[in-house]
Amino acid sequence: MTSLHKQIIESHNNDITKLKSSMSTRAAARRSVCLSSMSYTLGADDVTPITSNTTPSNNNNNNNTTTTITTTTTTPTISPLKQSTTGSIIPKSILVTKSGSKEEPIVSSSKSSSNSSSINNNFNNLYSASTFSSSTKKVHERPSINPGFRKPREALLSGNSDSGIIKKPSSSSTSSSSSSSSTTSNIKAPIQISHSSNSGSSSSGGNNNNSDDNSGSSTIKHTAASLSKMKLSPSHTISDSPRSSTMKSRSVSISNGSLFSPTNTSVNNSNNNTSSNIKTPTKSSISENLDQNTPPPPSSSSTTKTPTATTTTTTTTTSSSSSTSTNTTPSKSSVDDVFARLANVSKPAIKSRSLSVSASLARVEQSPPTKDKGDKESSSSSSSSSSSFSSKFTKILRSSSKTPTPTSSNTTVQPSTTSLSASKISSRKDTKSLSSFSTTTTTTTLKSSSSSSSSSSSSSKSNIASSSSSSSNNLTNLLTQSQSISSTSTSTTTTPTSTSPTLASSMSVLSSPTSTTTTSTSTTSTTTTPTKSSCTIITPSIALKLYINDLTSAEQSEILDYPQIYFTGNTNKKTKFNSQLPNNGYDNDIGEYKVVERDHIAYRFEIVSILGQGSFCQVVKGYDYKTGEMVALKILRNQKRFHNQALTEIKILEYLKTNDPNSTASIVHLNNYFYFRNHLILTFELLSMNLYDFLKVNHFQGYNLNLVRRFGAQILTSLRFLSKRNIIHADLKPENILLKSPTKSGIKLIDFGSSCFENEQIFTYIQSRFYRSPEVILGTKYDKSIDIWSLGCILVEIFTGVPLFPGSDEPEQLACIMEVLGAPPKSVIDNSTRKDIFFEDDGTPKPVKNSTTGELYTIGTKSFKDSIRSGDEDFDNFILDCLKWEPSQRITAEQGLKHDWIIKVIAPTAPSTPS
C-alpha cells in the first residue's frame, strides 16, 4: 500500500471522526428524547417537569470544576407540595451531582435573593422551559441515560436506576411547583442558562467562561424583568390519570370555545379518589373527551385559580367493552336498556383513523432546540441535516397550505392516508393497524415574557416541521406520546373509537382533502377527526412525482384519466394488472370486484372495510377524501344484467331524493355514482347496523312492542311516501332497514336494487323468501301491497326474534303460510301461473315435509295468536291486516298510520312527508 493510499485512508478516517463528533450532540439529544417519551408512555403515572431556575441560589464553589452528568428527563414529583412562607407552592427536590466518582446530594436554601451569584454548577447543562405545573402523585424514579447506550425497557418499567434522585433547589420566589425541563447528557456543546440582574449576570456552569468556550451552545438569557414576570408566568398543567396494566389510552379533544374563554378542567385520580378543579382563562381551550360527562369523585377536592396561557388536561379513559350482556331469559328488553347496551356495542362510526403529522415525523431526525432571538449566532445543533429535511418537507406542504394566519391553525389529517409527503419519510414496515384508535396531537408554543423563542431557519416555515413527535413502535403504536424538540410543548393523546378505519403510520398531508397547514406563531393544533373543510386537490402529474412508488405500472397510466387526485392507496397488496384474467385481473370469475382494504376507489375513496355482499353487488365502507365523510360504496358486479338493474335503481333513487330533499321519509339518499374499472359504483350516506344485526346483538330474543311500534310507524311512513309515487320497494327485510344511529330508534330503508315503478314491472322473482308475498310465490300480478306483506312479517320477527314463516324453499314457504293462515281462496289459486307446483288438480295443497323435523305440514293447525303471544290485540289485528291472501284486502300504508296500534306514536315518530 502506497503512502498516498495511507494518507487518503487516514484523511478519510479523520473526516469520519470529525463527522461523528459533530453529530454526537444531535444523536444524544434524539436518544434522550426517545427514551424520555418511551418512559413517559410505559410507566410514569404522573410526570411533572422540573421548575425553571427563576431565582439563583447561593453557592460558593463557583471555581470548582465538576463533571456534570444530566439527563433528558421529565422529573416526577416525589413528595407532596409544601406551602412556603410567602405563599408560593414549593416542592421538595434534590439535585445529585457527580464530582469524579462521588455523589453529593445538594439541598439549596429556600431563601431567595436578588444578589444571588449563581445556580449550582451542576445546572450547566440544564435548560428548562418557562412553564410550571403541580402534582401530588408519587411515581417511580427514572433511570439515568448515558449517550453511549440505551437501557432496556425492563429498567424503565421497573423504575430501577443507578443515578441519584434529582431534586431542585427550593425558592420562596417560585410561583409554581415545577416546570418542564429538558437536558442532554454529556453533550459537547452544553446549553447554558444565564440570569441577568442589575448587579450583573451569572452563568450556571463551573466556570463563568463556559459560554465563551462553548461557542456552539444555545444560551437562554433572562433579565431581572423577565425573572420577575416569570414568577407570575402562566402555568402549564399536565394532569395524568394513572395507567392501568392494560395500557389504557388517553383522550384529549380540542373544544371550539372562543379564545380566552374560562375553562373548567376536571382531573380525576383513580388512586386516591381526589379531584382538583382548576379554573383558568385559557388561550387554547382543551377539554376532556369522555364517553360521558361525569363529575369528579366527591371525596376530596381542591380548587386553584391561576392565570395561564394554555391549559392542557390529559385524562385516561377506558374504552367501553364491545361485548353485550347476555340475557339467559327470553324476557323482552326495554327500549332504554337496549340502546344503553348498544352504546357499548357500537360507537359513532366517523372517528378519525389516521396518525397525525407529528406522529409521522417521529421517525425522522428531530430538529434540535432553537436559539433565542437575542443570540445572533446559530447553534451547532441546528445543523444542515435538519434543514435539508425541513426544506423538502416544507416545499411539499406548500401545495396544500392555506393563507398563513398570525394566530392559530388547525391541521387535520384524515384516516390512514398514504398521504402525500410523510410516505417519503416513514417506512412501510412501520405501518401498524390501529383499528378503533384516533390520535390527536396538540402543539402549543409557549412564549417567554422577555423574548420569544424563534424556530431555526430550516423549520421556521412550518410549525409542523419544527416540532417532531416520537412514538413507541414497541407498543405497536397503541399509545403515542409526542416530545417537543424546540421551545414548544407537545401533547399527544390516543382516543378509542370502534368503527374507525385501521391506521397506518405512512401519512401524507396532501392526500387528505381537509388538511390545511399554516405558519402559526402561537398555537398549532393537529387533529385526526374528519371535518367538512375545504379539501386539497393535486393533479395527476404531481401525484406521479410524489407517489410513483405507491402506484402500480397500470395505475401510473390510469391516474391520468382522473383530473383530481385525492388518495392513491395505502397498501402494498394492490391488485396487479393482468390482461389474461377477467377485467384485467381486477375481477373474480363471477364478475365481482376484488376488494382490497386500504386501497383507493377512483383516487378519491379509501376502502376501509367490507360491509356486506349480495348476489348483485358488494358494499364497502369507505372514506371520501373530497368531502371528509365516511360513506357506503355499492360496487355492482361487472355483468350487463346487473348494470341495467343498477341504472333503474339510480333512476328511482334520484327521483326519491328530488322529492325528499330533507330526508323526512326515512329513505337512504344517493350521494353520487360513477364508473371505475368497468364497475358501476354508487355512494350513499353511511348508516349504522341493520335490524337483523340489531336482533343478533340481543341474541334473537326480540324486543318489546313499544320499540316494534316505533319501527312500524317509520316503515309505514316510508311506504306511504313510495306508494304516493307508485314505487314498489320489492325487497323489504330486516337487512334492508338500517338504524341511523346505534343508540337511537331512527331507521332508513335501503337497497332499491329490486325496486320498480308500479307500471314498469321488470322482475317476477323478487323479495327474500321469508318475506315473500303469496302472489309472488304463485306467479300472479303483484303491486305495492307486497311491501305491506313484508312489513307484517318483519314486525313479528322483531317482536319474537325469529321469522314468522321460515321456509327453506318456496313449497315449504307456502306451506308455512297455510299452516297459520289456512288455505288460500280459490280465486287466488285460479289466477296462479304456478299452481301445478303447489296444488293438486282439485285445488288441494300438495304435501310438504318440514325440512327440520321431517313431519308433514298441515293446513290451519297453528293459531296466529299462539304463534306470537303478544298479548296485545291491536298488534295482532294490525299484523293480520297486513297478511291477507288477497292483495286488495290488505291494509295500505295510509290506513296503517291511522291504525289503533300505530296511532300512539305517529306524532313523534312519523313526521309528515312531502306530498
Swiss-Prot record:
A GO molecular function annotation here is:
protein serine/threonine/tyrosine kinase activity
Q: Where is the composition biased (Low complexity)?
A: 51-79, 108-119, 170-185, 196-218, 261-287, 300-333, 352-364, 379-391, 399-425, 433-533
Q: Which Gene3D superfamilies match?
A: DYRK (3.30.10.30), Phosphorylase Kinase, domain 1 (3.30.200.20), Transferase(Phosphotransferase) domain 1 (1.10.510.10)
The residue ranges flagged as biased composition, category Polar residues, are 234-260
What gene name does this entry carry?
Answer: dyrk2
Record key words, sorted: ATP-binding, Kinase, Nucleotide-binding, Serine/threonine-protein kinase, Transferase
**What taxonomic ancestry is recorded?**
Eukaryota, Amoebozoa, Evosea, Eumycetozoa, Dictyostelia
Enzyme nomenclature, EC number: 2.7.12.1
The residues covered by the Protein kinase domain are 605-902
What the entry lists under InterPro entries is as follows: DYRK, Kinase-like_dom_sf, Prot_kinase_dom, Ser/Thr_kinase_AS, Ser_Thr_dual-spec_kinase
| Active-site residues, as the UniProt record annotates them | D731 (proton acceptor)
Its UniProt entry gives the catalysed reaction(s) as:
L-seryl-[protein] + ATP = O-phospho-L-seryl-[protein] + ADP + H(+); L-threonyl-[protein] + ATP = O-phospho-L-threonyl-[protein] + ADP + H(+); L-tyrosyl-[protein] + ATP = O-phospho-L-tyrosyl-[protein] + ADP + H(+)
Q: Mind telling me what this protein is named?
A: Probable serine/threonine-protein kinase dyrk2
